[in-house]
Each structure stands twice: as C-alpha cells, then as structure tokens.
Amino acid sequence: MEAYKKEFIEFMIECGVLTFGDFVTKSGRNTPFFVNTGNYKTGSQLKRLGEYYAEAIKANYKDDYNIVFGPAYKGIPLSVTVTMALSDKYGIDVSYCSNRKEIKDHGDTGILLGSKLNDGDKVLIVEDVTTSGKSIYETMPIIKEQGNVDVVGLVISVNRMEKGQGEKSALVELEEKYGFKSCAIVTMTEVVKYLYNKEVNGKVIINDEVKTRIDEYYKEYGAK
C-alpha cells in the first residue's frame, strides 16, 4: 500500500472522521463504521485533505482536465482545497466549480460558483463519500446543462465498497452509466487491512470483535 494511503487512514482517525461502533446509514443500513467528513474543520486539516486528493488524482489521472467540480454542499470547500493542492504540489493550475442548491434571485443569479462551464471543458468531480451515488446522479444533469462538457472522472475519499442500486458498487454503477473513471484515496478493504490489530495513538482501532462485525456487514451489503 502506498505511503500516502497509510497516512490518510491515520489522518481520518486523528480527525474523528472514521469511527467504528453502531451507526445507521442514510439508506437505513446498520453499519459498524462511519465516515463523517464534516469533522474536517481546521485550515490545516483541509489543507492536508486537499493534498491527499491531489496525490490520488495524480496517481490515477493524466492532466486531462481543466475544472475540478465539487457538488454542494461539502464539495464546495473540497473543490477549492483540491485545486490549491494540485497547484502547490504539482504545478497543475486548474479552476474550481461548484453548484448552488438554491438559485439566488439577486446579484450573481447563476447556479454555479467559481468557474463557469463552457463547451470543451473537461471536468473532474470530487466528492467525499459515495454510498448510493445519489449526489452524482443529481449533479450530472447540472453539469451537462452547461454545454458540451466532458466529465472525465470522479474522485472520492473512501470507497465503502457497498452495493449501490443493484449488486454492484455505486462507483461501478456510475462508471457504467456515465463512462468515466472513478477512484478513491482508499478503499474500506485497505482501511481494514491496515488498521486490523494496529495501534493508532496507543489504541487498537480494529480488534477481532470489530473485524468480525465488519466481515458480517460485507457479507450482506458488500458489492459483488
């Protein structure tokens, strides 16, 4: 496993973003782990988050994009920090774009924030976590309405590797529907493998009991 992936897993633990216990997802599933990206709160945390995304983007995509798009709301600061990291780390100077949930009736009344989308633009979407793919299904029509725009990929922080609308993962379903390449900084398989019986800040995060619960969860909800 690449060093940046290991660092990112520990970073999520330190920020309280990745936790293990008893949770219920938006889709009603009882899950033994939870990813709450709202716990990235400080400037230094957001800076590091953007750098991890930038590393994943550099590892999985060529420089064949000129817009980084973050779906509202969590994707707004994410798209900003990712574009800054791409510039700082790799000298890749691209624009950010996000959408509004509500259209303003004064001032700038457009639905987009940041760069406008024009014919010929190549868009890379950044999202926090995609379980069902709902936000992307809502975002794609907004992007396509702006003109002849090509969405070249989707990058998320953690691939939960769960069933989407069918037996396949939400990411695979999105790839098949829209024809773009998706990737994650880490997958839950990588997370579990790295954290199993490993101490982080003096505490074992995934012991035998937690590992058993995760395995049982994926027997029921894991993507085929």
Curated annotation (Swiss-Prot):
NCBIfam families: pyrE. Catalyzes the transfer of a ribosyl phosphate group from 5-phosphoribose 1-diphosphate to orotate, leading to the formation of orotidine monophosphate (OMP). This is Orotate phosphoribosyltransferase. InterPro entries: OPRT (IPR023031), Or_phspho_trans_dom (IPR004467), PRibTrfase_dom (IPR000836), PRTase-like (IPR029057). It is an enzyme of class 2 (transferase). One of its GO terms (molecular function) is magnesium ion binding. PANTHER family: OROTATE PHOSPHORIBOSYLTRANSFERASE 1-RELATED. Orotate binds at T131, R160. Keywords: Glycosyltransferase, Magnesium, Pyrimidine biosynthesis, Transferase. 5-phospho-alpha-D-ribose 1-diphosphate binds at residues 26, 73-74, 100-101, 104, 106, 127-135. Homodimer. The keyword Glycosyltransferase applies. One of its GO terms (biological process) is pyrimidine ribonucleoside biosynthetic process. The keyword Glycosyltransferase applies. The lineage of its organism: Bacteria, Bacillati, Bacillota, Clostridia, Eubacteriales. It comes from Clostridium botulinum (strain Eklund 17B / Type B). Pfam families: Pribosyltran. It catalyses: orotidine 5'-phosphate + diphosphate = orotate + 5-phospho-alpha-D-ribose 1-diphosphate.
